[in-house]
Amino acid sequence: MRKFKILPLLLLLLTMATSAVAQKKTQKTYIPWDNGKLVVSEEGRYLKHENGAPFFWLGETGWLLPERLNRDEAEYYLEQCKRRGYNVIQVQTLNNVPSMNIYGQYSMIDGYNFKNINQKGVYGYWDHMDYIIRTAAKKGQYI
């Protein structure tokens, strides 16, 4: 008799777990810029989107992200930030001048001459920074 009391409870728990997993798989990434650019409110006290939707800045500080993490580590870090609800990742573009990324590439290869900044086959400093920005954008995060 006790088995019959537990069976409906187990079926209910199984149904709830299956529903939660299915819902998580179909959940889309919220892309905040679908609401337009960020603008300062009329009274100058907060940020909002062009369409009037409020913007809540929940930031994580990954200051040395472009210099210390490779692409796999950066993707993992940004995913962890997304799971925790961070929508802004604050990084330093240049910690020093020149800065060097994890791949040993300098931010200022030839002084301030940016003509040959991205070399083929190399994760250059600015190429790596672009990768981080694109990866964050796919996760609905501002850099």
Language model features with spans:
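Active-site-adjacent substrate/metal-binding segments within catalytic domains
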Residues: 28-143
